[in-house]
Amino acid sequence: MELAPKEIFEQLLKWFVVPTFDLVIEIENTGFVLVKRKIEPYKNQWALPGLRMYKGESINESVARIAKQEVGLNIDVSKKILIGQYVGKFKTENQRQDLSTGYYLKISKGATVSINPNHFSKCNITYSIPGNTGAMYKYYLEKAIDLR
């Protein structure tokens, strides 16, 4: 799959909304997988694993890729539950705007999380929402807590 060069992608952010997926992954009886971001937007804040959709991917392919690429988990996407959408407007160089779709996924206890070190500095598996959590992620976590 060919991706736009970073310079071109950054320029497109000035005019286009980016479709993204964010995953509330609950490890059974343990907590939600939270990650501390190293990159913008939400740099140095607690977040959920998430990335943009690539051209040619189905929703299920995107969700599976994100779980594997961002936190090293192979998930059964057929059991995903739509929990909402969120429009993120960011004070970045190009005034980036994302249309995020959030999905809830529950996986078996004992799953091993392996974070993407290029994107995240830490992982926290908890049922609490840390104070330094990005607004979009807090919204999705609150929705997921209501589902439990």
What spans do the regions from the language model cover?
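Acidic, metal-coordinating catalytic segment for phosphate/diphosphate chemistry
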Residues: 1-22, 28
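Small, basic N-terminal interaction modules of short regulatory proteins
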Residues: 1-8, 81, 92, 97-99, ...
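Short connector loops at helix/strand junctions that flank enzyme active sites
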Residues: 16-20, 43, 48, 96-100
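Hydrophobic (often cysteine-bearing) scaffold residues that line and stabilize catalytic clefts
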Residues: 17, 59, 133, 137
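Conserved Nudix-box catalytic region and its N-terminal flanking loop in Nudix hydrolases
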Residues: 31-70
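Active-site segment of metal-dependent pyrophosphate-handling enzymes
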Residues: 72-111
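NUDIX/MutT-family hydrolases
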Residues: 102-104, 112-148
